[in-house]
Amino acid sequence: MNQISNPLKGNNNKIPIWFMRQAGRYLSEYKKVRETTKNFLDFCYDVNKATEVTLQPIKRYGFDAAIIFSDILVLPHAFGWEIDFKENIGPILKQFKSQEDFKYLQSNPNNKLGKVYEIIKKVKADLTSTTSLIGFAGSPWTVMSYMLEGKGKHDFKTSKKFIYENKILAKELLNFITEKTADHLINQAKSGADVLKLFDSWSGVLPEDEFTKFVIEPTKKIILKVKEVFPKIPMIAFPKGAGLLYEKFIKEVPVDILAVDQMVPLEKMKKWSDKVIVQGNLDPVVLLTNKEIIKEKAYKIIQEMKGKNFIFNLGHGILPKTPPENVEFLTECIRSCE
């Protein structure tokens, strides 16, 4: 049985495992391939290289799912938006400010997303039937906030000020991104993705009213649109940092799998697993420590979630300085509990 695609697993003894950023800079084999292409987005669009790095952690660790190597910002980039990735800085974007910018976004599509779908097809052909392939996109609020801020890590003052002061334009931009995100996910499913995930990295910065408008409502629209075409495809949502609003999210969004960050108590995860499959939530920093700590923290999660609808993952992505042998040890710990 494909453990991630069928996470309500008929085999309750097997805990599905995969990790966010499982293909990445902590792997020497990844760095070797990455060094061959200077521009990060060019690397994301290179069919052979992106396929190779997607498969690397599967070959090394035997995870239950591969997640396609791509980036959440390929979507605005596919509509002509200026994006550059600076070494040790992150993405730098043209800042979205006006109705003129919205008109530009609507009139400058390109065919770059076709490369993503080619990569999915190529990866799918190389995976066994027991390994799921996860396609993904950034959730509308997170993609929108990158465009409004013009950069990555930030304090979100610019984004929030914009949505408060420009309600109509903010809604137009949100709706545009929502529609295109749904289309992007549908095309990934058509190309062979078994599971789809929405990453909302910055959802936790919004107050409740804005969380409803910019996180819950667009996520719900995307899921419903995808399910019209692929009613049985499992969909994962990750409203990172949602805190107390996770429960509102579960109640209002028809998601199959809820990914949670490391700040969510295990008691909450157990409770929620009666309504939705829960994915998470080991602190990625634990993988920077030693085997004793890794084993202790992993076993605690496994014991608490035993018999529940649960997928083992981290609370966020694998950190670049993570020793690969620690990832292997964690995987062995989880497998030993089956």
Curated annotation (Swiss-Prot):
Its EC number is 4.1.1.37. Disulfide bonds: none annotated. Its main location: cytoplasm. This is Uroporphyrinogen decarboxylase. Belongs to the uroporphyrinogen decarboxylase family. Catalyzes the decarboxylation of four acetate groups of uroporphyrinogen-III to yield coproporphyrinogen-III. Keywords: Cytoplasm, Decarboxylase, Lyase, Porphyrin biosynthesis. It catalyses: uroporphyrinogen III + 4 H(+) = coproporphyrinogen III + 4 CO2. PANTHER family: METHYLTETRAHYDROFOLATE:HOMOCYSTEINE METHYLTRANSFERASE RELATED, UROPORPHYRINOGEN DECARBOXYLASE. The record marks 71 as: Transition state stabilizer. It is found in: Cytoplasm. The keyword Aminoacyl-tRNA synthetase does not apply. The gene is hemE. GO terms for molecular function: uroporphyrinogen decarboxylase activity.
